[in-house]
Every structure is written in structure tokens, then in C-alpha cells.
């Protein structure tokens, strides 16, 4: 067997999905094939410090990893890790991972797996850093990550691509805080209750509310504006919530379709990660033509945003008409034990370790495809 690929797994981050990231990363670290990959880990604390971690994997979900990382040696958090000087070299193609000590040599890496959800993780920011440094990385590029994270602009792209979706409006935080009554009036002119209110840039249903009347709508608008400066309002679709996984670069393929059966009124953050009351059905009990339509729309959305590597695309299937509506796309879906993305591929014939290997290979493939040759 040849040399192992050196993979850097990054977890944590400063978003509201920090805890989900830690759980996703732990799941990946437990399933990655160590016969093929040499794995290093970096955790990003909630206050944005990057820490090299080589301790037990099972200390990551609880957050204990941070204390262990800080106790490693006598270095303080200030000199333990420095992003630009000591962790990732921004000299193009340097691909360097260094520990903050004069006595330790740089550890080279081949691929980064950024298991980061939410802002500053899957919104194109960290992807831009990897592009600048010339390091292959798992997942979508800067453009697809940024657009996929912004629900409003993703909807604009889906509309242009001809993919059916719920009707919508959007407002800025300034508009909401400045005249919430006026914003409510505009929403009521267009939609009847209930409506969904969402921060434009947030994942895992963070900041999302279902408003049934004027008072709930006001509260929902102010609540969503806490999480982002843009707020999306969508008409209510009385639909079943289904999801489809996509894998690939230029020739992506779609998985089977799974259904979320929410334990709450809708599949919010609590239902996903805290109460564990929702149920998952894979494959979804849907007519074959509906499944194929969902799979086709998933690939169409993936291509419309110029995604690469992976994405999970969420849909509604109207309970009465059977019409399919795209809800949103997630360019770094969860990898927890209850996450749809790996489960959908497992049902489709790709095991978790195989899936991780394919994602790493796709990252290298895209990196090589993007290399530009210039005439001297």
C-alpha cells in the first residue's frame, strides 16, 4: 500500500452550530479508514481560537477536548496556535500544518475536511482561506458555499433554474427594527397564516419560527433578526419533509430519498438535536415518479449552485397535491449518528467509511481540475 493521505479534520467554529460540528466530526473520525488516511485534528473554540488536538476522539462531543488541548505542554492559548503563522501556511501550495513550537517541524497535509456548520464554516469564508493557501478541501467551493448558506440568494438561483419552491419575501434587520408593524402589513398583504420566518444565513433550523398570527409574526421577525441581518418569510406548504443526498463534482449522483417525520410542529433545532422526538424513514414511502422527480431536482439544484463534493437538498411534498417544492440546500450537511446524509448513502449502497473516502477523493479531483496553466 502506498503512502497514506494526510487529512486534517477541522471542527467546532464560532457559529450557533458549534456543538453539532463537534458531534459530526466525532462521527467522521470514528468511521474514517485509518489504514488509508493519517488524520490530524484542529478544533476551533467558540471564541475563535484554533487549537491543535491529538487527544481522545470521545472527548470532542462534550467539549472536553479544549481543556485537554490547552493542557498539552506549558503554552498558553495565545501561543498554542496561530492561524496564519503556525497552522495553515498561506503560501500557495505550501499545504503546511505546524504546531506552535520551534522544536517541532511542519506537518504536511494533503486534504482538509472542514466539518464546520453555519457561519464562518460553510459560508465560503474558510473555503476562501483554503483556496488562498492552495489546499484541497472537502465540500463545495467559495461561491456554492456562500450562496447555499444564504437562503434568499439560493432561492433566487432556484427560481432561475426553474425548480418549484414556496413563495417568499425578505426584509433587512434595519427594516424590521425600524418599522416592524409596516413589515408585518406587507407580509399579511401577500400571505395568509401560518408563515415561516427564517434568518437568511443560519443552519440546523436555528432562529426559525412558524408564525400563526400577527403577534407571533412580530416575535418571529425580531427573533430571526438576532441571527442575521436578512430575514426570509415563506408561505406555508402543507407538505411532508423529505431529503436527498448528492455526491460528486461535474457528474453528481443523487441518493435514495428519506423522510423526516417531525415530533414537533416542524423539524426545528430542538427536534433535530435535543429532544430526539422526530423519526426518519429511509427510503421514503413515495411514488416512484415522485422519488425520481426529487432526485432530478436535487441534482439540478446542485449544478445550479455549482456545488462540488457533497450537498443535502431538502424538499416538501404537498400532502394533498403531491407537488414537489425545494426547501433549501445544505453544502456541509450533518454527519452525526442521526444525520440523513450518511444514512441516505448507506441505504444507497455506500458505507460510511467508503463515503468519507469518496469525499476526500472528490476534493483532490476538484483541486486538480481547478489548477490553471499560464503561458510564460
Curated annotation (Swiss-Prot):
Top EC class, one word: ligase
EC number: 6.3.2.4
Keywords: ATP-binding, Cell shape, Cell wall biogenesis/degradation, Cytoplasm, Ligase, Magnesium, Manganese, Metal-binding, Nucleotide-binding, Peptidoglycan synthesis
Gene3D superfamilies named in the record: 3.40.50.20, ATP-grasp fold, A domain, ATP-grasp fold, B domain
GO CC annotation: cytosol
One Pfam family matching this protein: Dala_Dala_lig_C
Pathway: Cell wall biogenesis; peptidoglycan biosynthesis
Cofactor note: Binds 2 magnesium or manganese ions per subunit.
UniProt keyword annotation of Chloroplast present: no
SUPFAM superfamilies reported for this sequence: Glutathione synthetase ATP-binding domain-like (SSF56059), PreATP-grasp domain (SSF52440)
Alphabetical list of NCBIfam families matching this protein: D_ala_D_alaTIGR, PRK01372.1, PRK01966.1-2, PRK01966.1-4
Family per similarity comment: Belongs to the D-alanine--D-alanine ligase family.
UniProt name for this protein: D-alanine--D-alanine ligase
Organism: Acetivibrio thermocellus (strain ATCC 27405 / DSM 1237 / JCM 9322 / NBRC 103400 / NCIMB 10682 / NRRL B-4536 / VPI 7372) (Clostridium thermocellum)
Gene name for this UniProt entry: ddl
Amino acid at each position: 500500500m502506498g503512502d497514506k493521505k494526510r487529512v486534517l479534520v477541522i471542527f467546532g467554529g464560532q457559529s450557533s452550530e458549534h456543538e453539532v460540528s463537534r458531534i459530526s466530526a466525532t462521527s467522521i473520525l470514528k468511521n474514517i479508514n485509518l489504514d488509508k488516511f493519517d488524520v490530524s485534528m484542529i478544533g476551533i473554540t467558540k471564541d475563535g481560537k484554533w487549537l491543535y488536538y491529538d487527544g481522545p476522539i470521545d472527548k470532542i462531543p462534550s467539549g472536553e477536548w479544549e481543556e485537554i488541548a490547552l493542557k498539552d505542554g506549558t503554552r498558553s492559548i495565545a501561543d498554542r496556535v496561530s492561524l496564519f503563522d503556525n497552522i495553515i501556511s498561506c503560501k500557495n501550495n505550501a499545504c503546511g500544518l505546524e504546531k506552535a513550537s520551534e522544536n517541532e517541524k511542519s506537518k504536511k497535509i494533503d486534504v482538509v475536511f472542514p466539518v464546520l456548520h453555519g457561519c464562518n464554516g460553510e459560508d465560503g469564508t474558510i473555503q476562501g482561506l483554503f483556496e488562498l493557501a492552495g489546499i484541497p478541501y472537502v465540500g463545495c467551493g467559495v461561491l456554492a458555499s456562500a450562496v447555499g448558506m444564504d437562503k434568499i440568494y439560493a432561492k433566487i438561483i432556484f427560481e432561475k433554474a426553474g425548480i418549484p419552491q414556496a413563495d417568499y419575501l425578505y426584509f433587512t434587520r434595519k427594516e424590521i427594527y425600524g418599522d416592524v408593524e409596516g413589515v408585518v402589513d406587507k407580509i399579511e398583504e401577500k400571505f395568509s397564516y401560518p408563515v415561516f420566518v427564517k434568518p437568511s444565513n443560519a443552519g440546523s433550523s436555528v432562529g426559525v419560527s412558524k408564525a400563526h398570527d400577527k403577534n407571533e409574526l412580530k416575535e418571529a421577525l425580531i427573533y430571526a433578526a438576532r441571527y442575521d441581518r436578512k430575514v426570509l418569510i415563506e408561505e406555508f406548504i402543507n407538505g411532508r419533509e423529505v431529503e436527498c443526498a448528492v455526491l460528486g463534482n461535474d457528474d453528481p449522483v443523487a441518493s435514495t430519498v428519506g423522510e423526516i417525520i417531525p415530533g414537533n410542529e416542524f423539524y426545528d433545532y430542538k427536534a433535530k438535536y435535543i429532544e430526539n422526538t422526530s423519526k426518519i424513514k429511509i427510503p421514503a414511502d413515495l411514488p416512484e415518479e415522485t422519488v425520481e422527480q426529487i432526485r432530478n431536482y436535487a441534482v439540478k439544484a446542485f449544478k445550479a449552485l455549482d456545488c462540488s463534493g457533497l450537498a443535502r437538498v431538502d424538499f416538501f411534498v404537498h400532502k394533498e397535491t403531491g407537488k414537489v417544492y425545494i426547501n433549501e440546500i445544505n453544502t456541509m450537511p450533518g454527519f452525526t449518528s442521526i444525520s440523513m446524509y450518511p444514512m441516505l448513502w448507506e441505504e444507497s449502497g455506500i458505507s460510511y467509511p467508503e463515503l468519507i473516502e469518496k469525499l476526500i477523493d472528490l476534493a483532490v479531483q476538484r483541486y486538480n481540475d481547478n489548477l490553471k496553466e499560464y503561458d510564460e
